[in-house]
């Protein structure tokens, strides 16, 4: 780290490096609305704590967020802010509602087929005009289902070829349905996909090689494309209805990147009613929903009177050094306390958790994840056994091998249950499940909880020591050498990074850049790696 640095970080990364930073001159937070508890973002605690801790260093502050009408006044006063709201837009937007043939009849299950037909006709019309279009849908399964039906409805199907096809064949499966969609000029924007797959599709779309992208809520996570049209097929985000805030955020994806001066929004269902959006700030408001991990990380002077009794309940009977461990874990204090008391009262369980290998056996990992599942999370299921199996599989095998194992497992499971699925359905379901597991469980949730468990085990243990860090690194970095794992954040496939062998301990990235031709990379991998370097 040099004297002057520019960091672009997630809230989790901020918390990792902040202890090494003495001063912060300028602090900019994009998509600041995610600090609100109303947004139900699973990482809201990290963002609140990171914001609070950075602000203790008194930096200049700039907060950026769309579609907010007002902000908590107490927050404004505490940090001496000025709230500036603008409705200015570089793009003129036109909206059009698509009605059913029975004009007064809302879209529902009874006329769902007509709704789909109307969508496909609209997409054909927009494609004929060479207008790039994004279709917002409520879930990944719905995106896949509509893409599949849309291809069937086409009279002429294009046969496009993309560099990513070679990578898909080598690392996923030549039967993956995404390949079929891309060949027909259709993309899927799914938050479960590896970053490079998402980035590649956006590149093809922006270059005019994809006509349509079916997208889920991942669309509103700061994605910029050349889309002239946004079609809002469903006013839901999963099962819940989208809010007026979400609706505006989705609409805002039309006509960006200065290619078009008009963006068109088409929608089928009645949009949410307009409401003034006031941004709540948990670290300041401190209502009854305030997460315990946020509360204990506030300085005593910043804890409101009505929360002080809650704070005392959380910390009573906790030694000061244990409280510091709990605070640094950024995880529910109640759950950590429950885990601590359980291990304290069960020395046999504690001793079984004192492992430090890079590659734990299935039995060791299953036992460890069982403690997390049953005690930390309070579940009575045996779900941890399946998690342990998948973790072992992911840490020992290539992505393609993991998928093959999952396909075999699913076939066996479905045969036992007497359920009928085609080979294609099983393959694609297996791929979706594995990609989702890697993104949500292996790279984030399991490492986080293993770290919490390790810290409490080592606090209680008087003899041996637990060290899960090597195994955690394998999961988080997809088995990539830690010296170059930063390239994962730039969207380089882990398959490419695993091919970079015998790297020097110092200046590894520079070494890779200057010796790129010696590594056995596919053209697709090489192109992405060159861009990242």
Labelled PLM ranges:
Residues 1-6, 17-18, 120-212, 227, ...:
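Conserved C-terminal RecA-like helicase domain
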Residues 7-10, 28, 59-66, 212-215:
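Structural recognition of the conserved hydrophobic beta-strand(s) that form the central parallel beta-sheet
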Residues 23-28, 211-236, 248, 263-268:
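A short beta-strand element within the Helicase C-terminal
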Residues 11-60:
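SF2 helicase catalytic motif II
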Residues 306-533:
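C-terminal accessory/interaction regions of large nucleic acid-associated machines
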């Amino acid at each position: 780290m040099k004297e002057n640095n520019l960091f672009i970080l997630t809230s989790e990364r901020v918390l990792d490096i902040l202890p090494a930073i003495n001063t912060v001159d300028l602090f900019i937070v994009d998509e600041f609305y995610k600090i609100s508890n109303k947004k139900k973002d699973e990482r809201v605690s990290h963002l609140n704590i990171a914001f609070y801790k950075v602000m203790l260093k008194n930096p200049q502050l700039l907060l950026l967020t769309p579609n907010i009408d007002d902000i908590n006044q107490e927050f404004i006063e505490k940090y001496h802010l000025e709230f500036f709201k603008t409705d200015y837009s570089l793009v003129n937007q036109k909206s059009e509602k698509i009605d059913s043939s029975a004009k007064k009849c809302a879209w529902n299950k009874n006329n769902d087929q007509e709704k789909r037909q109307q969508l496909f006709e609209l997409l054909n019309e927009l494609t004929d005009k060479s207008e790039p279009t994004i279709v917002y849908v409520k879930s990944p399964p719905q995106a896949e289902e509509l893409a599949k039906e849309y291809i069937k409805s086409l009279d002429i199907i294009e046969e496009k070829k993309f560099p990513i096809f070679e990578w898909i064949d080598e690392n996923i499966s030549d039967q993956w349905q995404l390949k079929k969609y891309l060949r027909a000029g259709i993309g899927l924007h799914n938050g479960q996909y590896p970053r490079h797959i998402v980035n590649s599709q956006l590149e093809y779309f922006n270059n005019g090689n994809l006509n349509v992208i079916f997208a889920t809520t991942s669309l509103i996570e700061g994605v910029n494309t050349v889309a002239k049209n946004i079609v809002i097929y469903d006013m839901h985000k999963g099962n819940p209805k989208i809010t007026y805030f979400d609706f505006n955020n989705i609409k805002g994806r039309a006509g960006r990147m200065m290619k078009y001066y008009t963006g068109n929004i088409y929608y089928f269902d009645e949009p949410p009613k307009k409401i003034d959006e006031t941004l709540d700030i948990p670290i300041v408001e401190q209502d009854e929903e305030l997460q315990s991990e946020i509360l204990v990380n506030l300085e005593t002077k910043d804890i409101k009177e009505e929360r002080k009794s809650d704070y005392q309940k959380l910390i009573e009977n906790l030694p000061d050094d244990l409280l510091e461990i709990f605070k640094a874990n950024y995880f529910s204090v109640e759950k950590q306390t429950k885990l601590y008391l359980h291990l304290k009262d069960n020395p046999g369980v504690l001793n079984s958790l004192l492992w430090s290998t890079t590659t734990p056996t299935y039995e060791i990992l299953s036992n460890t994840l069982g403690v997390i599942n049953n005690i930390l999370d309070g579940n009575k299921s045996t779900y941890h056994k399946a998690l342990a199996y998948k973790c072992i599989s992911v840490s020992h095998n290539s992505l393609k091998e993991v998928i093959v194992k999952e396909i075999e497992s699913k076939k066996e499971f479905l045969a036992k249950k007497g359920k009928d699925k085609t080979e294609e359905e099983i393959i694609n379901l297996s791929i979706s499940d594995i990609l989702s597991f890697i993104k949500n469980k292996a790279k984030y949730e399991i490492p986080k909880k293993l770290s919490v468990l390790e810290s409490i085990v080592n606090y209680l243990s008087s003899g041996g020591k637990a060290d899960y860090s090597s195994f955690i690194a394998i999961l988080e970095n997809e088995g990539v050498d830690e010296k170059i794992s930063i390239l994962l954040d730039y969207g380089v496939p882990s398959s490419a990074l695993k091919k970079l062998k015998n790297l020097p301990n110092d200046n590894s990235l520079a070494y890779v850049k200057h010796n790129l031709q010696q590594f056995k990379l596919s053209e697709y991998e090489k192109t992405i790696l060159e861009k990242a370097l």
